[in-house]
Structure formats: C-alpha cells, structure tokens
Design a protein with these regions (language model features):
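Structured secondary-structure scaffolds
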Residues: 1-78, 131-135, 190-237, 272-303, ...
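A cross-taxon signal for low-complexity, glycine/charged-rich
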Residues: 238-239, 243-270, 644-645, 649-691, ...
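Catalytic cores of secreted or luminal carbohydrate-active enzymes
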Residues: 750-770
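Short hydrophobic alpha-helical runs that function as membrane-insertion/retention elements
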Residues: 388-393
C-alpha cells in the first residue's frame, strides 16, 4: 500500500497554493462576507512557537470552514514590528532595528507558509513600514485636532533598564513587562490620548459584545466606574480656628463660621485653597475625622508645612518606589502628617491632613476623606496614628458636595522615549509651543542613526539626529491671523506600539491604498471584523481598538461603532510539565522541529486543535502528537484502499495489522488497542459486537453514521469546540475501518478534515475527483436503524444488545435475542421467572 509521506504531500500543495493564490479576497456583490483575523504577532528572532500555531490554526480552521461553505472569506496577515525588543537588540549588537525586523518578518512569513495557512498574502502589513505608519501619524493628528491627544506633566512609571515610560497596564507586579526589572516613578511631560472621554460608551457597550465573559468583566473592572460626590475641604491654618466650649468640652471650630469677632481675620488661603475629595459615601461626611492624600497628589508641595516638609518628601520618595499592587496589600499602614489642616464642611471642625500610600493618585482626585468608623483601612490608619474615630449617623450630602462620576481608567499614555517606534507628528517653536506636522508632510520618517542608546536625561536617541530635528512648517500667527513658515524642532518621543495596533484591522481592507488609511468602499464591504482570535491584551489593545473605533465613527470615517463582532480568546500551550514555555527555561517547542521530524504540518495543526478546549491552557504531549499522526495515516490508508478497489466497487476493510484509535470517554486523549488476528477488536469487547453488527451494515445505518458525523463536526466548529470536532472525525474513521469505506464516505471525510489537515484533505479530494464544498446533513438520517438495549439479570448489568429500531415494539423478539446471548445463558440455566421490558429506557430485566 502507498505510504503516507506528509512532507512530500505538503510541499506539493503549498507550491500549488503559492502559484494559484486560491485565498485572494476580493469584494463580491451579493455574496456574504466573512472577515477573520488573529491578533498579529511580534516577529521575534526566535520565530514561531507552538503558541503562535494554536492562534493561527484556529483562524485557519474557521477560514477554511467558511470558505467551504462558499462565503467570501478574507484572512489577511501582518506583523507588529515596532517596539523595545528590536531596539534593545540594536543597542546590544549595533545592527539596525529596520534590518533585523526585515529578517524576522521574512522568517515568520516562511514559517507561516510551511503550516499551510489560507492567507491572502496580498493583504500583508508591517507596522514599521513608512506606508503603514504614515497613516498611524494621520490617526494621531485626527485625535489631536479634536483635543483628544494632549500633553501633561505627571508621575509616570519609568523603567531604568529600558529607559522609557510605561503605561499602567505595562507594569506587572511592580516590574517592567518587557525586561522584568523593577520600575520607579518619574515626573515627566508626556503625550496622552483622552480615552476617558469615551468611558461611558466603552462601558455601556460591553454587555452586547459576543466576547468571552471574563474579558468583558476585565474591561468593566478596568474602566471602573464609581458614582458618588466631590466635596471641598478648605485648607486653613491655626489662626482660622477658635476654641468653643460646649457643655464643658472644648472643640476647635472654623473662625469663618463663628464670625471675625471670635476668630479674627480669616487666613488668606481660606477661600482659594481647598482639597477636593471624591467619595462614593458622601452620606458619611459627619464621620470624616482626617484627610489622606496620595504621595503623588499634585498640590502636596503647597500644602505641607515647613516643619513637616523633610519627612513628607522622604515618605513620598519611598512610596513612589512601590507598585500600586504593593500599596494595596493588607500590610501595616504607613503615613506622615503634613502639618496642615482642613475644615470638615459638615461639622465645621478642624481635621488633620495626612499622606499615605494606601491612597492612589489614579483614583478619584487622589485625596480621600477618612471615615474610620465606616471604613476598615481608615480605621487601621486611625488606630496606628491615634486619630479620632467618630460614630455617626448617615446624612443627606447635598449641601456639602456635588454629584460626581469617576473612573478607575486613566487617559492612555502613548509617548515613549525610544527610537524604534512611530514618530509623533508634532514640532515645537522657539517658545516651546506644539504644532502639528501638516498632513502633506507625512510620513515623518525615522532617520538612519548609528547610536540607538537613549540619553540619561530620558530623551530618545532621536534627540541626537540633529539634521532630522529641524523642520519648517506653516504656523498661523495668533495676532495677525497670517500663516508663515517657521523653523521648529521635532518631537523626539515615539508612539507606543498599541497606537499602531489600534487600527490595523481597518488597514487590512485596503493595505496598498496611498490616499486613505482605509478605503471607504472596502471598509463598507469587509468591516467590522467578524471573528478575532487571540490570547492577550484584554484591557489594553482590546480596549484601545474599541476607543479608536468610536472616535473615527464620530468623525465619519467608520460606519460602525464596535470593531469586532466575535472574539475567541484561547489558552496557552505550556511545556509538557505544565510550566509556561520560555527561552530562558529552554523548554520552547519549535513547530518546525515537529514538522521536520516527519509528522508534517497537518499533524501539528490537528494536534493543537485536539489538545483540549480552546479556551483553556494545555500541556504539550509528544505522545499525543504521534497519535494524531497515526489518525491521519489511517485516513490516507482509507483513501489508498478505496482507490485500489474502486474498479470492483466493493467495500474492503484494511489489513488487520493496522491500529484502531479510540477516543476515551473519560479523557480527551488517544489510546491504542490492536486488532486481533481476525481483523476484529478483542473478543468480549463492546467494540467486537458493534463491529460484528456492522460488518455488512444496511445503507440506512451507514447514512446515519455519515450524517451524524457531518452534523457533529459542523456544530462543533461553529461553537469553536475544535477538540470534539476532531474526536468525531476519529470516531468516524473507526467506523469506516469496521465497515469498509466507499467513495461517498471518503468524500465526506476529506471535506470535514480539510479545515484541520488541508494538505491531506486536498490530496484526497483531488484523487476522488470532487470539490471541497462543505457537506450537509439531513435530519431523516440522524435516527439510527439500530439501538442499544441494556440487559439485566436480577437488576445487574450482564449484556448489551444491538437490535433493529423496528424490533423495539416486539418485546418477545428482544427477550428471545437476550436469552440466546452466551453471556445471558449462564445466568438462566435454572429457568426464568419473568421478564420486564421498558421500551422508553431500552432496558430488559430478566428475573431468575
């Protein structure tokens, strides 16, 4: 029999696909479209890993599945090529990031083609190509024109190793997400996108998304909407208070409210110096006995007294070294008194102002009113520093504050002090005023430089490119209204990579358009993306792309407000011991090693779909890879056997030396059991009686098996239950080995197999002389001609019989079949008292 040689087979079909371009997508009037994409990869020097394969293969299975149903499918491909790894490699080796990235892209493309993916290679994009980042800069300018791209000075996470700022979501457990080094806080002027402008719409639209619940929950929590009130607490000094005796007790009260005769002149800052706090419980204001400020609070330097300044500055420096996670842990509270006081507007009493790191600058205003009687953290703080705890009743807050809604989400920090990124299209005049680069001067190209190391001041290497820095742009004179050309200095920060990935799904529709970021006709036909597949970026990329979509819809550039209809979020492929794969651990599985070991791409693809439920992590199992190879080998043997016997038109079983692959009902794994010398499963097994019953089965039963399999695989792919779809195909092949397979059986097998193993399936379809259109099932064939009847003796299971469905109405015939069974005879030698047959349960009980 002809041998299954996957590498030779795959080389043949990949050459055909390269030449014929069967996956080129074009707009077709009246044909339903399907736009499927994966989160595009960063092309590292290490090349593809098996995690990429899972991601890409999910997309490919769906692409081929819908193409076989004759939808107009677009599956593009791209590379997220800007970023720190390429630049750090350039600093280390002296090689240009541009050259290194080009090599990596070439390698990734070659590897993707080895896996046989149905990609339209004419729709390939690269975020570091000028043709692409010209339009990233255009996107920035649209946001800038509407006031949604702006600069401000604030404390930012700073990685001292990579020498760049990091967004909140790029700090993991207090460390840089790239290099793993501990981060610190640094005050810098940075560029931001005002994503908070769309906070409500981003939140309100989440529930309607066809996305995994855990991703929707993560986005809700990241946005973090809180409804409450803002309350002003005036800052005052000692001269603003008088002592008042009430029933023998003394309290300090604001002089303003008791009159100048009792308190003297008001402090000069009384009316214009205040601390505004946000609280979700304004009704507890009577219990507020002190205020607490975050160490980063912007007005702290103006509040602290001279006596407390040294202690406050020392505490702030220590606090800024901690991550937000560390500051929120249930450790002993720390803090320092500012030496300043405020007035509780409800009680009119003097309360101290403290600084503590359990208050975060990113929440509310960065200041809280502490109500130790109602809040556990405030109570712990009060007890440690001997601050008053006042039990209080709840009240109406209207006279003291104003309703306010705040969000945990901050505006999106998008500037980076690195060379290898998209240049920000801004230049500064001699007075430091920012001006946009005119659109007709885009793209602002990255200059060729020799030294990629950022300087110690925090500026990127672009600051060293003196010729590049100077640019003349038209600027309108504020006084005369006239426009004149002036010399400016370019911005030396570059855009965060997330800016490049926030719009690439729209660039795919017209990747070579020189006049538009995305062509209007193409975006109207293809977008939004129907299915998007990935395993990362739940609250970064997936939130940013929604923000940009809503913004550009408001500007009239997009006809929809949500960019992605359905999101598939899959688990990781881990090492065999269950640990995460990493180069440092030396446990990375190279997919090309698996292919070149003789298993081929089809085996690798099918195994990764069979490895487990798509949404869960899975451990790599080399033994199961071999099991999947044997399954595909059996498919090929069925084909060869059928072709060899096609002239006779007979059904033929394969040689008895082959291996039966059975799916365990308890675990999603392959197990092996050898056929006995007669070509049947071992005696006494359920499979043996089943095989005997179907050795020469009626056409109705064969049709039932075939249509049942079509229905199962179709529905499983729709539900992204790829592992059970592959299992159903394995079961179908087992049945064909028992019964023998004719052409119709193999046609169905090849068509169902193609999304998973396209090379083998294409070979089968070619030899069978049919196209790949997806098969359909008919309901009338889903009811089997045979059913299983359980036989008990005195209530204990003793046998299972396969009987014709029509015989269920003939109780005596079923009893006769049972009594004739060898397994039952040994229990009925002394006679039978009675028999009880329950038709609905398909159960016969024999009482002896």
């Amino acid at each position: 029999m002809e041998r299954y040689e996957p590498l030779k087979l795959e080389e043949k079909w990949q050459k055909i696909w390269e030449k014929e371009k069967p996956y080129k997508a074009v707009e077709k009037e009246g044909v339903p479209k399907m736009y499927i994409a994966e989160m595009f990869p960063y092309p590292s020097g290490a090349g593809l890993h098996v995690g990429h394969v899972r991601n890409f293969t999910i997309v490919d299975v769906l692409t081929r599945f819908y193409e076989q149903q004759r939808l107009n499918v677009m599956r593009p491909f791209g590379y997220d090529t800007f970023g720190l790894p390429a630049e750090n490699y350039a600093i280390k080796t002296g090689r240009s990031p541009k050259d290194v990235t080009a090599e990596n892209v070439t390698n990734f493309r070659k590897q993707a083609k080895r896996l046989g993916y149905a990609i339209d290679w004419d729709r390939e994009i690269n975020t570091s190509s000028p043709e692409y980042y010209k339009w990233t800069q255009w996107c920035f300018l649209q946001l800038y024109k509407k006031g949604l791209a702006y600069q401000k000075e604030s404390y930012q996470w700073w990685c001292p190793v990579d020498q760049t700022v990091l967004a909140n979501e790029q700090v993991e457990n207090g460390c840089c997400w790239r290099c793993g080094h501990e981060v610190e806080k640094k005050k810098m002027k940075q560029w931001f996108f005002k994503i908070t402008e769309y906070a409500d719409e981003l939140l309100d639209g989440i529930d309607a998304l066809d996305w995994p619940d855990k991703i929707k929950t993560m986005q809700k929590n990241w946005i973090g909407k809180s409804v409450g009130a803002e309350i002003d607490f005036p800052i005052v000094g000692e001269t603003n208070f008088v002592s008042i005796r009430d029933n023998g007790s003394e309290r300090r009260s604001a002089a303003r409210d008791d009159g100048p005769a009792r308190g003297g002149e008001q402090n000069q800052f009384y009316n214009n110096r205040r601390i505004t706090v946000f609280t979700t419980r304004p009704d507890t204001i009577y219990g507020a006995t002190f205020l607490v400020l975050a160490p980063e609070y912007p007005g702290l330097d103006y509040i602290v007294s001279d006596d407390a300044r040294e202690a406050v500055e020392k505490y702030r420096a220590e606090a800024l070294l901690k991550s937000e996670i560390e500051r929120q842990e249930n450790k002993e509270k720390t803090g320092v008194f500012t030496g300043a006081f405020a007035v509780n507007p409800a009680t009119k009493e003097k309360i101290p102002i403290w600084v503590a790191d359990y208050v975060l600058a990113g929440y509310g205003t960065g200041a809280i009113m502490a109500v130790p009687a109602m809040d556990e953290r405030d109570r712990e703080f009060a007890e440690k520093f001997d601050l008053p705890v006042v039990e209080t009743e709840l009240c109406e807050f209207g006279q003291f504050g104003t309703p306010k809604t705040t969000y945990r989400m901050r505006d999106w920090l998008i500037s980076r002090q690195r060379y290898w990124g998209c240049p920000i299209p801004i230049a500064y005049d001699a007075e430091g005023n920012a001006h946009p680069i005119p659109e007709d001067q885009l793209p602002v190209l990255l200059p060729e430089i020799d030294d990629y190391q950022p300087d110690k001041s925090g500026r990127s290497a672009l600051a060293k490119a003196e010729d590049w820095l100077k640019v003349k742009i038209p600027v309108k004179d504020a006084k005369t209204g006239k426009t004149k050309m002036i010399e400016c200095t370019r911005e030396t920060d570059t855009l965060d990579g997330y800016a490049c990935s926030s719009w690439y799904l729209w660039r795919y529709v017209s990747p070579h358009d020189a006049e538009h970021a995305w062509a209007p006709e193409a975006i109207n036909y293809w977008a939004p993306t129907d299915i998007y597949v990935g395993a990362d970026h739940a609250v970064a990329h997936l939130l940013y792309v929604r923000f940009w979509c809503k913004f550009f819809a408001d500007q009239g550039y997009l006809p929809f407000r949500e960019p992605i209809k359905k999101l598939i979020y899959h688990g990781y492929i881990n090492a065999p011991d269950g640990k995460k794969m990493s180069k440092s651990k030396g446990n990375v599985i190279d997919p090309l090693d698996v292919i070149n070991d003789g298993y081929g791409a089809d085996t690798l693809r099918t195994y990764e779909m069979f490895i487990g439920p798509v949404e869960l992590d899975a451990a790599w199992d080399p033994r199961s890879v071999g099991g999947v190879y044997r399954f595909l080998n059996r498919c090929y043997n069925l084909l060869c056997s059928n072709v060899a016997n096609s002239c006779s038109g007979s059904r033929r079983s394969l040689p008895s030396t082959d291996v039966v692959c059975q799916l365990s009902s308890r675990k999603n794994e392959l197990v092996r059991s050898s056929l006995d010398s007669s070509g049947s499963p071992p005696r006494g097994s359920r499979a043996n009686s089943r095989a005997a019953a179907l050795r020469n089965p009626p056409n109705q039963e064969l049709a039932h098996i075939r249509h049942r399999t079509v229905k199962k695989v179709t529905e499983d792919i729709y539900k992204c239950q790829f592992n059970t779809a592959v299992s159903a195909l394995m079961e179908y092949v087992n049945e064909l080995y028992k019964t023998g397979a004719d052409k119709e059986d193999l046609v169905v097998l090849a068509k169902l197999l193609k999304p998973f193993a396209p090379h083998l399936a294409s070979e089968m379809l070619e030899r069978l002389g049919v196209d790949d259109e997806w098969p359909k099932w008919e309901e009338k064939y889903l009811v089997s001609d045979t059913v299983e009847v359980v036989v008990q003796v005195n209530g204990k299971l003793r046998a299972k019989l396969m009987v014709d469905t029509a015989d269920l109405d003939d109780e005596q015939k079923i009893v006769d079949l049972a009594l004739a069974d060898k397994k039952i005879k040994k229990y009925t030698v002394d006679g039978v008292k009675k028999t009880i047959f329950v038709k609905k349960a398909k159960l016969l009980n024999i009482v002896v």
